[in-house]
């Protein structure tokens, strides 16, 4: 439904705030090519996804954003979580990892999580994330190193921190799209005129009318920022029971995105004096 677009959650930015940053070109990473033969409704969507991935890998080194997420976990939909995120995209030259995938997160809402901080850097800290709790718990619990896919780190989460970020989202969309492309029962629509926090987006809507074991969702919407050429929101819904609304599986919205802000190792260092590890 259109209600997504005008959700009060997606607060307006200050008028005139412009998010583009100068584009910095780096060595291109190989991106697999999209299928040529246009014989499945998903093909135009896959072409957009491959182009977006190429753009991310060629032109976007890092970004900061507010991530707002809700997920169906342990039988219920979580409340909205707001996180300030800094992400440095993985960069490879030949077979060498030039820049490891790096994430810093600070939780802003809800109150019980406010102040929680998490850092993950690929190939560092023996593969572990470093975290400390926020809220009341944060006052007496120590900073811990955790396996990203272990039970503690995954509590209340659908996916590990290693899956976070816009590039990972695009990779997942391509994987889902290529898998769904092997089957029929799929309708794809492009809807113009949507806005996410005042920014023009095109919505890619994918529906699988009939529930099948090989489909992940009944309906998914990808909001692509027309200027930034990257997805800024993904929402997926399961099949509704008779007369019910389609239940939410997961939704992720990136707001206040600032590209190529020049993040450094210090942004992903637990000893950063601006952090509370």
Question: What is each stretch, according to the model?
Answer:
Residues 4-39:
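Compositionally biased, proline/threonine/alanine/serine-rich low-complexity intrinsically disordered stretches
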Residues 10-11, 24, 38-40, 58, ...:
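Hydrophobic transmembrane signal anchors and adjacent membrane-proximal interface regions, especially
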Residues 26-28, 87-89, 122, 190-192:
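Surface-exposed beta-strand edges and flanking loops
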Residues 36, 42-43, 206-207:
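Short leucine-rich amphipathic alpha-helices used at interfaces
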Residues 40-138:
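N-terminal mature ectodomain segment of secretory-pathway/periplasmic proteins
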Residues 69-74, 106-111, 119, 125-277:
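Gly/Pro-enriched, hydrophobic low-complexity segments
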